[in-house]
Every structure is written in C-alpha cells, then in structure tokens.
C-alpha cells in the first residue's frame, strides 16, 4: 500500500513537471512577451519545486523499503529539488536584473537540473512499477 501511494505521488509529480517544463513554459514564451512569460514562470517555479520537495520527500519515506537504488535516486532527487528551490532559483532571480549574460548561464544549469529531477523521478516510478 505504501509503495502504491509513493508511485501515485511520484507519477503525479512526473506528469506535472513534464507538462509544465515541456509544454506550459515554452508556450508562455511563445504567446507572451519575454518579460511577461518570465514573470509568470518566476511565480510558478517556487511552487513547482516546493511541491516536488514535499511529494518526493513523502515518497522517499513511503518507499524506504523499495531498495537501495530507490533510496539513492530519491535522496539525489530531493537534494536537487532543494538546490533548485533554495539556491538556483533565488540566484537566477537576482541575476536577471543585474547580469543577464550570467543569468542565461545559470538558466541553462537550472534547466539541466530540472531535467535530472524529472529523469530521477521517472527512474523511481519505473522501480516501483517493475518491483511488483
């Protein structure tokens, strides 16, 4: 039962993250001015990563008996979410107004971390699916 709930939480986060990262964010930048789209994304990302911290944290607790690989991926996933929420996103926010060139570099790093978060989440989902 605990693993099914962990699977549901991780699947929800994976779907949410994929939808936002690969559809919503790019669409915002296509239909809105860059500044407007950036303002929207700037408000959404802390909620997205905060929710990820909660869901991944709960799933890590619920799936603690799912093996070392699940735990390792879960801990790394949680650390990357914390990094995004409390270090990278605030740094990006500050750089956007002061050093746009450096902002773009950090933005690339942030995108890579987000992709890693989604891939780690997918890995944990697959572990739980195939563990059955």
Curated annotation (Swiss-Prot):
Location relative to the cell: Cell membrane
Q: Which UniProt keywords apply?
A: Cell membrane, Membrane, Transmembrane, Transmembrane helix
Q: Which InterPro entries match?
A: TMEM205-like
Single GO cellular component annotation? plasma membrane
| Stretches of the chain forming a coiled coil according to its record | none
Question: How is the protein disposed in the membrane?
Answer: Multi-pass membrane protein
- What are the TM regions of this chain, as residue ranges? 7-29, 44-62, 69-88, 108-130
Q: What is its main location?
A: membrane
> What is this protein's name?
Uncharacterized protein aq_125
Q: What taxonomic lineage is listed for the species of origin?
A: Bacteria, Pseudomonadati, Aquificota, Aquificia, Aquificales
């Amino acid at each position: 039962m605990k693993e099914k709930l962990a699977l549901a939480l991780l699947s929800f986060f994976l779907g949410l993250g994929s939808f936002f990262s690969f559809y919503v964010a790019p669409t915002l930048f296509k239909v809105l001015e860059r500044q407007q789209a950036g303002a929207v994304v700037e408000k959404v990302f802390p909620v997205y990563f905060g929710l990820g911290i909660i869901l991944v944290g709960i799933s890590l607790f619920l799936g603690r008996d799912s093996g070392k690989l699940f735990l390792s991926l879960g801990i790394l996933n949680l650390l990357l979410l914390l990094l995004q929420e409390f270090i990278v996103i605030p740094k990006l926010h500050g750089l956007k107004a002061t050093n746009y060139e450096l902002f773009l570099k950090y933005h690339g790093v942030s995108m890579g971390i987000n992709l890693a978060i989604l891939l780690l989440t997918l890995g944990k989902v697959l572990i739980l699916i195939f563990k059955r």
